[in-house]
Amino acid sequence: MKELIEAGKITHWGISEADEDTLRRAHAVCPVTAVQNRYSMMYRDYEKLFPVLEELNIGFVAFSPLANGLLSAKYNKNSKFDAQTDYRSAMPQFTARAFDKNEKLIRYLEEMADNKNATPAQISLAWMLAKKPWIVPIPGTRKYDRLIENGRSADVELTEEEVKEIDRMLDRPANVRGIRRVKSRVRYRN
């Protein structure tokens, strides 16, 4: 990457799924512009990287910020996903048992969304945007109306206290259930 930058072929570069050690080693060779990792209310493990990102002035691109759609509150324990075509069929947060555990979080998002004239997805994204100015969520969508809805999350304002309140709720293990990846996909990660 350093050679490509020096040759003028690229101006910035980033890495995905990086932990602190990988990030520091890469940055020592060629300054990293951004790191892309999974991050959402359901998966906050990479928050431990935030001090390093601030120290090194690296942006954070958050993929799956809506936890594969769970935080949109559009699904429930009766939702079915085709095992042949929809990877959510194998994701633990979409089991009936997980929905029972996550119901409190979903209700909380719906209530806050009603109070803010927003959607649960917008609250989830606004929470992320309020965390740090260098976080850029990249929610995936196939539908135009979801694209517009997600974009409008930038207009939803959460106070510092509201963000802390959400964090306190998320810190209680009883309120969040689901894991990062299904076992069949873990083997592809080093």
Q: Where do the PLM segments sit?
A:
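Acyl activation and transfer enzymes in specialized metabolism, enriched
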Residues: 9-12, 110-126
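Active-site-adjacent beta-strand anchor residues
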Residues: 15-16, 64, 118, 137-140
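Glycine-rich beta-alpha junction loops
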Residues: 19, 39-45, 64-71, 127, ...
